[in-house]
Regions:
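Nucleotide-activated sugar donor-binding and catalytic core shared by glycosyltransferases
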Residues: 1-431
Length: 431
């Protein structure tokens, strides 16, 4: 089966080059160390008989942040050496900022084609490999088997679309899954999906979602919150000031227009709702600004420095600040969930920070977490823009309900922790 993959990879990759170059230029990524993607990572001496070198691959920012408790626990073991790879430029940046003192090396993951993958394997020389969530790189997995190195998929999940794709691929998918030594699923339903696709019962276990174990950041101090509000052009909170903030977290095209419309409508109804838009792709700032120019609302673009006047809307076009903006907010809308979007973005961060959370019907990629938040009365699911407007208006008018949802979120988080420890226990046999 690996030969079929290799034959298909090259023409698909060649056809994709224009898009890859356009995408990299548009997002300003891969300016440094792009050669890693061709396997040109630094040579590492073989690990000693008393130590284990673990190669962890986490595709982007969300996964890089999610593995923090795991990396901290593994790096504390004197017999363990870690090498971390990631796929995206933003993930690479966050990895260096977060893990420089915890890992032996941080590189870009090689393109999954035999010459690049083999070169990276010859240079990294791992004793054990970990893949995050749904990353199944056939060549990487093949090299693990070829080198007799165990490989595990952790925090494993399958979106609806990926599950359907793997079902259609049939034998190719089964051969990949059979090469995995361990699959630690993020939920019971995800474990069932993997088993349906042909994984072995003894190697497939639900352990929970390790993202629930990521420590919540310390709350913003009063002074820090006041300073941040001032920088953004938002009024300071007080008993007399009834200003409320809605954060649109990781929004996609079309959703910003809906949130702007809702903000306008509530302002006209006498509700002082301010909006922080954090687009999933920050390079879309010009498109969002164009939407705002057709309104009477004042706005500020975060990357341009501190606001010089009071504004109704902030375009938060910076990376690494979403957590602060969620903390500053009273309500959080999770992006990529309103029609026509269907996949959703992770709602965990809003939940773990104790914020009432809203999302549309399209949460297929985070179905289990979304359902859990709904059942715990933390989140509210809406069908469309009008339903979102009604729900936001109701929550703005009901502070007790907002506070109750926040308390529910804290209880939910405590109840869902422990996946990192269960993951460590499960992989111990390979170390």
């Amino acid at each position: 089966m690996i030969w079929a993959y290799r034959i298909l990879f090259l023409p698909v990759f060649i056809l994709s080059i224009p898009y890859i170059l356009w995408h990299a230029k548009r997002r300003g990524g891969y300016k440094k160390d792009f050669h890693h993607k061709f396997g040109n990572v630094p040579y590492r001496e073989p690990s000693s008989s008393q130590s284990k070198r673990i190669w962890i691959q986490a595709v982007s920012v969300g996964e890089i942040r999610a593995i923090k408790p795991l990396i901290e626990a593994l790096s504390a073991k004197p017999e363990v050496e870690l090498v971390l790879t990631t796929t995206t430029s933003t993930g690479y940046k966050i990895a260096h900022e977060t893990y420089e003192n915890h890992v032996a090396g941080i590189y870009y993951f090689p393109l999954d084609f035999v010459p690049f993958t083999k070169k990276a394997w010859r240079r990294i020389r791992p004793d054990f490999c970990l893949l995050m969530e749904g990353e199944l790189w056939p060549e990487h997995i093949h090299q693990a088997k070829r080198n007799k190195v165990p490989i595990a998929l952790i925090n494993a999940r399958l979106s609806d679309s990926t599950y359907r794709l793997y079902q259609r691929l049939g034998g190719l998918t089964r051969s990949i899954f059979k090469s995995l030594d361990l699959i630690l699923a993020s939920s019971d339903s995800n474990a069932t999906r993997f088993l349906d696709l042909g994984t072995r019962q003894e190697n497939t276990k639900p352990v929970g979602n390790i993202k629930c174990d990521v420590p919540a950041p310390p709350p913003l101090g009063d002074g820090e919150a006041i300073a941040l509000r001032k920088e953004l052009g938002l009024p300071a909170a007080s008993d007399k000031n009834q200003t409320l903030i809605l954060c649109g977290a990781s929004t996609w095209k079309g959703e910003e227009r809906s949130l702007i419309t809702i903000c306008e409508a509530l302002q006209k109804n006498g509700i002082d709702l301010r909006l922080i838009i954090t687009p999933r792709h920050v390079e879309r700032r010009k498109d969002i600004e164009a939407e705002l120019q057709n309104t009477s609302l004042k706005y500020h673009i975060r990357s341009r420095g501190s606001a010089t006047e009071d504004v109704q809307i902030v375009i938060a076009d910076t990376t690494g600040e979403l957590t602060k903006f969620i903390q500053l907010s009273d309500l959080v809308f999770v992006g990529r969930s309103l029609p026509p979007h269907t996949g959703g973005q992770t709602p965990i961060e809003a939940g773990m920070l104790g914020k009432p959370t809203l999302f549309g019907p399209g949460m297929a990629n985070f179905r289990d977490i979304a359902r859990s938040l709904l059942n715990a009365d933390i989140a509210t699911q809406v069908e469309d823009e009008e339903a979102l407007r009604i729900t936001v208006e109701e929550l703005c008018a009901d502070p007790e309900k907002r506070q109750a949802k926040g308390r529910n979120a804290q209880a939910w988080l405590v109840a869902n922790q422990g996946a990192t420890q269960r993951t460590l226990e499960a992989i111990q046999k390979f170390m």
